[in-house]
Regions:
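Single conserved hydrophobic/aromatic residue that forms the stacking wall/gate
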Residues: 1-13
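Short, well-ordered coil/turn segments that N-cap beta-strands
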Residues: 11, 43-45
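Glycine-rich beta-strand-to-loop/alpha-helix junction loops that act as flexible
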Residues: 14-23, 51-54
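Metal-dependent catalytic neighborhoods of phosphoester/phosphodiester hydrolases
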Residues: 25-27
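Alpha-helix-loop-beta-strand connector modules within alpha/beta enzyme cores
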Residues: 33-42
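Charged (often Lys/Glu-rich) extended helix/loop segments that serve as interaction or gating elements
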Residues: 35, 46-201
């Protein structure tokens, strides 16, 4: 261990980030362990793997409802009560296309539909998906792999409600953990401010 590196800093360590999908089927854990051991030996440091998205990989579902179906030129559109901008920001930031249960199955009569959110953001688009039947008003659509960023990076842009969180137990029973409402949106904007203050400006 280089005393110049650790002087005044205590132990020297290396944080390796959270991008490794160590829970993914087929991930070469043995190779990762060898790489870590080799790095520890060569640089005399402790290495920590951030408990990142691997711990929730492919976990969590996001249930949405179709609000409207329309046609724009050659593009079929379905507007959902779920928003890429508010509820799945990684869709826009990475970009990322979440899996959708029952969609993209092979079939001769599959129709392609662009799914989007109801906010005023023109880019509030989740993605294009293939369906055997055209979704209609009131249909439920369920996205998978939603536990990673939907819970920690969601927002209430345009007053969009946050999704309630439910726990599905091993015996298939359900328990509601959260119940978000307008009060949560209002509270983030300063609900304690006296409205008369704005009238006097």
């Amino acid at each position: 261990r280089d005393p110049e590196m650790s002087r005044g800093l205590g132990d020297v360590y290396k944080r390796q980030g959270g991008g490794h999908h160590i829970t993914r089927p087929g991930y070469d854990i043995a190779r990762l362990e060898k790489c870590i051991e080799a790095a520890k030996e060569e640089w005399k440091v402790d290495i920590y793997l951030e408990p990142g998205e691997a711990w929730a990989l492919n976990a969590g579902f996001f249930l949405t409802t179709v609000l409207d179906v329309l046609q724009n030129g050659d593009t079929r559109l379905a507007i959902l009560d779920g928003s890429a901008a508010c509820h799945m920001p990684d869709v826009l930031e990475m970009p990322y296309r979440p899996p959708l249960l029952g969609a993209d199955e092979p079939g001769e009569n599959a129709v392609t539909i662009r799914l989007g959110g109801p906010t005023c953001l023109s880019g509030d688009v989740i993605g294009d998906y293939k369906f055997r039947q055209l979704p209609k008003y009131g249909d439920f659509l369920m996205f998978g792999d939603m536990a990673i960023y939907t819970t920690c990076k969601n927002n209430t842009f345009n007053g969009m409600p946050l999704p309630d969180i439910w726990l599905r137990r091993a015996d298939s029973t359900m328990q509601q953990l959260t119940d978000f409402g307008y009060g949560d949106f209002k509270g983030r904007l300063g609900s304690k401010i006296n409205p008369e203050l704005f009238m006097s400006i």
